[in-house]
C-alpha cells in the first residue's frame, strides 16, 4: 500500500523511528512543506504526533534563505556558504534582526515581519526595505566581492538561527 505523509511529519518520522529512543521531542524546521514550516512532535513508542506548527510565510528556513540571497548566493543551494562565512564574522546585526525581522516568543514560536520580504509575493527573497535596514545593497555574486560586512551578516543570521532553535528546544 502506497501512503503519502505530510512533509514535516515525514522528516520527524525518519528522525524518530530510526533513532534509538523510545521517547523524544522532534523539531523540524525548513523552508516550507505543504504549509507548515516548523513542527514540534512528540514520539513515544510507535506513536508520533505533531503538537505544534508554524505556518508559511513565517519560516526560519526562508529567513535564512533571504540572507543567502542578500549575500549573493543561490537560494536552496548556497545556504551552506552563508553558514561557512559565519565563523569569519561577528554577529553585529543579531539584535537588529531580532528587533526588526523576527518576533521570537518565549515558547519558541515566531513571526517574520513580511514588509521586509518578497518571497511570498515576488521573484526575489528580499526588498529594498530589507537592504535599507542594513545600509547595503543585495550583493551581486558575479561582480561584487565578499566583504567583512557579508561575514558579519552571516554570523548574525547564524546566531539568530541558533537562538530560535535553542528557544524552541527549551520550551
Segments predicted by a language model, with ranges:
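Short acidic/glycine-rich loops and adjacent helix/strand connectors
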Residues: 1-171
Amino acid at each position: 500500500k502506497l501512503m503519502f505523509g505530510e512533509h514535516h511529519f515525514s522528516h520527524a518520522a525518519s528522525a524518530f523511528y530510526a533513532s534509538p529512543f523510545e521517547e523524544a521531542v522532534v523539531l523540524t524546521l525548513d523552508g516550507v512543506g505543504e504549509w507548515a514550516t516548523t513542527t514540534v512532535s512528540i514520539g513515544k513508542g510507535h506513536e508520533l504526533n505533531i503538537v505544534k506548527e508554524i505556518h508559511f510565510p513565517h519560516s526560519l528556513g526562508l529567513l535564512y534563505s533571504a540572507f543567502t540571497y542578500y549575500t549573493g548566493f543561490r537560494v536552496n543551494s548556497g545556504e551552506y556558504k552563508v553558514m561557512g562565512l559565519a565563523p569569519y564574522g561577528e554577529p553585529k546585526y543579531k539584535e537588529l534582526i531580532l528587533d526588526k525581522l523576527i518576533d521570537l516568543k518565549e515558547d519558541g514560536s515566531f513571526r517574520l515581519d513580511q514588509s521586509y520580504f518578497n518571497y511570498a509575493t515576488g521573484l526575489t527573497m528580499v526588498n529594498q526595505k530589507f537592504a535599507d535596514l542594513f545600509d547595503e545593497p543585495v550583493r551581486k555574486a558575479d561582480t561584487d566581492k565578499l566583504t567583512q560586512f557579508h561575514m558579519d551578516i552571516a554570523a548574525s543570521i547564524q546566531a539568530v538561527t541558533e537562538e530560535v532553535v535553542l528557544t524552541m528546544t527549551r520550551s
